[in-house]
């Protein structure tokens, strides 16, 4: 996709316009945004992308995205780091990792937020890291998500929602993740779960899966997410759930070694064509594992 086409798709769908918590009115900031991110044709390989940068290294079955190679968008009220192309950050070689389309590391200023905006046919996951966000949507949900929670929306046939930092004196930090679904035009739904953070101490805590009866929230995709908080020297083996899936590791804090590759804070590592990975914390570390299909159904 050419940049002009990418931007042309970009007037509504990401919700990157400011709204204050006092008036709750959208304030235009003339930012180009995506209107829609369409799923590739049936059974078309999605594969991986990497940015052509000296600090992004691609090897036989891995791709390393260093933290300082991410897109950097500072709008004043919102400071966002984009692992993959998003809004004004466009790199044709860094569009997705399999069905993982968006990984944004966001900071929202006190009293500000994302005004009401639409989505369709996307699985949208939010993981708060610090502070509280108030969520409102067209399904009638009004709730607050905070550190320790995980939120999921299946946009399906279409939803509108907003997210606001109701705190007047501190920012909110959270991860915003989009995953292409394996079913289109499903009935929209909302899910939220408070996790026991002690369940990830020196072990992998499953927080998302394809199965509504499994641990964590669920989505319309054969994907599994795990969070972990490892002390220095802790090691584990992650075994893939599905053959043909890839694993994207986003390191939130500290230093990790994954199959001999070191990643630092806010680095991302994608790996595929393998059955298991060895993960070792070189320092105290917190990280997110995202196992996702590398091809679309």
Question: Where is each model-derived feature located?
Answer:
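Glycine- and acidic-residue-biased ligand/ion/polar-headgroup-sensing regions
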Residues: 120-136, 147-150, 238-259
């Amino acid at each position: 996709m050419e940049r002009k086409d990418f931007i042309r798709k970009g007037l509504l769908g990401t919700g990157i316009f400011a709204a204050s918590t006092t008036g709750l009115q959208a304030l235009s900031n003339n930012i180009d945004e995506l209107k829609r991110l369409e799923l590739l044709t049936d059974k078309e390989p999605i594969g991986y992308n990497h940015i052509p940068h000296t600090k992004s290294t691609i090897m036989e079955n891995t791709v390393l995205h260093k933290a300082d190679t991410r897109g950097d968008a500072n709008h004043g009220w919102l400071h966002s780091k984009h692992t993959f192309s998003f809004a004004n950050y466009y790199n044709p070689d860094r569009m997705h990792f399999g069905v993982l389309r968006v990984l944004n590391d966001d900071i929202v200023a006190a009293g500000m937020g994302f005004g009401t905006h639409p989505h369709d046919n996307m699985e949208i996951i939010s993981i708060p890291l610090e502070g509280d966000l108030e969520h409102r949507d067209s399904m009638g949900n009004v709730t607050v998500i905070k550190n320790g929670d995980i939120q999921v929306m299946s946009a399906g046939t279409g939803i509108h929602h907003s997210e606001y930092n109701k705190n007047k004196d501190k920012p909110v930090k959270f991860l915003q993740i989009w995953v292409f679904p394996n079913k289109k035009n499903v009935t929209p739904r909302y899910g939220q779960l408070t996790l026991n953070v002690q369940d990830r101490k020196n072990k992998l805590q499953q927080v998302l899966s394809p199965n509504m009866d499994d641990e964590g929230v669920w989505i319309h995709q054969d994907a599994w997410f795990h969070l972990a908080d490892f002390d220095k020297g802790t090691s584990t083996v992650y075994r893939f759930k599905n053959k043909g899936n890839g694993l994207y590791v986003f390191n939130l804090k500290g230093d990790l070694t994954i199959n001999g590759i070191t990643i630092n804070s806010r680095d991302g590592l994608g790996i595929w064509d393998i059955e298991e990975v060895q993960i070792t914390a070189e320092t105290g570390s917190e990280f997110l594992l995202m196992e996702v299909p590398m091809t679309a159904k």
